[in-house]
Swiss-Prot record:
This is Bacteriohemerythrin. The keyword Metal-binding applies. PANTHER family: BACTERIOHEMERYTHRIN. It comes from Aquifex aeolicus (strain VF5). GO terms for molecular function: iron ion binding; oxygen carrier activity.
Length: 131
């Protein structure tokens, strides 16, 4: 297991918390698959994660615009940074299919980013959105 669900802060918005829980489930499934070196299944999960991240970020951004969230530009900028970084990892995966590189990215970059992002930006956003 890459990350326990209770290691990512709940933000107090049911929708956002559910999205984060589902993303953690997918991340753990991908991590376990990569550790088993099941390249075919990992390839499917990388595709799924790419779509999941875009849906997650886009939906949050739409909510922020709808509620005129004051920090929308900064929050979106963090999404854009991770969109770009994950796409780089994804594209490299599609060429090389190297499980170790994706595992390193997940452990050293994505999980720390997710914890920080949720605690800093999503929790603030959730306060404005309410439940």
């Amino acid at each position: 297991m890459l990350i326990r669900p209770n290691k990512v802060q709940k933000v107090g918005n049911l929708f956002m918390d559910t999205v984060h829980e589902e993303e953690i489930r997918l991340l753990n499934q991908l991590y376990d698959t990569l550790m088993k070196k099941d390249v075919e299944k990992a390839d499917q999960l990388m595709d799924e994660l790419l779509v999941d991240l875009e849906d997650h970020f886009t939906t949050e951004e739409e909510l922020m615009r709808e509620f005129e969230f004051f920090a929308y530009p900064m929050h979106k900028a963090e999404h854009d940074t991770m969109r770009k970084r994950f796409k780089e990892v994804y594209d490299k995966w599609k060429k090389e299919k190297n499980p170790e590189e994706v595992v390193r990215f997940l452990k050293e970059e994505f999980v720390p980013w997710l914890k920080s992002h949720v605690a800093r930006w999503d929790s603030t956003t959730a306060q404005q959105l309410g439940d």
